[in-house]
């Protein structure tokens, strides 16, 4: 696919890139190859093929959450770098 200098200028402006002349030539070639590949993909017959969000079949492998009503405040506070009056102390984040 043929890419013009104006197209490269437009795309580089959108991407906030400042390209040198040799970089523009390489970008023209690369963008042309990418668009050519996309055109080739458009020729594929995808009838009956179910869309997918991942290349590999994915499933959630995490454990189920289990709600418990435990009172282990002291045990939890052992993990706190700082504590005061039974509460976690954290650095101030807002002035």
From Swiss-Prot:
- Keyword NAD on entry: no
Q: Does the keyword ATP-binding apply?
A: yes
Q: Which GO terms describe its molecular function?
A: asparaginyl-tRNA synthase (glutamine-hydrolyzing) activity; ATP binding; glutaminyl-tRNA synthase (glutamine-hydrolyzing) activity
What this protein catalyses is: L-glutamyl-tRNA(Gln) + L-glutamine + ATP + H2O = L-glutaminyl-tRNA(Gln) + L-glutamate + ADP + phosphate + H(+); L-aspartyl-tRNA(Asn) + L-glutamine + ATP + H2O = L-asparaginyl-tRNA(Asn) + L-glutamate + ADP + phosphate + 2 H(+)
Q: State the Gene3D superfamilies in the record.
A: Glu-tRNAGln amidotransferase C subunit, N-terminal domain
* Cited InterPro entries: Asp/Glu-ADT_sf_sub_c, GatC
- Supply the NCBIfam families for this chain: gatC (TIGR00135)
Protein name in UniProt: Aspartyl/glutamyl-tRNA(Asn/Gln) amidotransferase subunit C
Record organism: Lachnoclostridium phytofermentans (strain ATCC 700394 / DSM 18823 / ISDg)
């Amino acid at each position: 696919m043929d890419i013009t200098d104006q197209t490269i200028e437009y795309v580089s402006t959108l991407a906030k890139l400042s390209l040198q002349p040799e970089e523009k030539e390489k970008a023209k070639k690369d963008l042309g190859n990418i668009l050519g590949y996309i055109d080739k993909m458009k020729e594929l017959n995808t009838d009956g093929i179910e869309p997918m969000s991942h290349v590999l079949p994915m499933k959630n492998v995490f454990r189920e959450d289990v709600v418990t009503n435990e009172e282990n405040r002291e045990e939890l506070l052992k993990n706190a770098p700082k504590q005061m009056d039974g509460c976690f102390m954290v650095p101030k984040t807002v002035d």
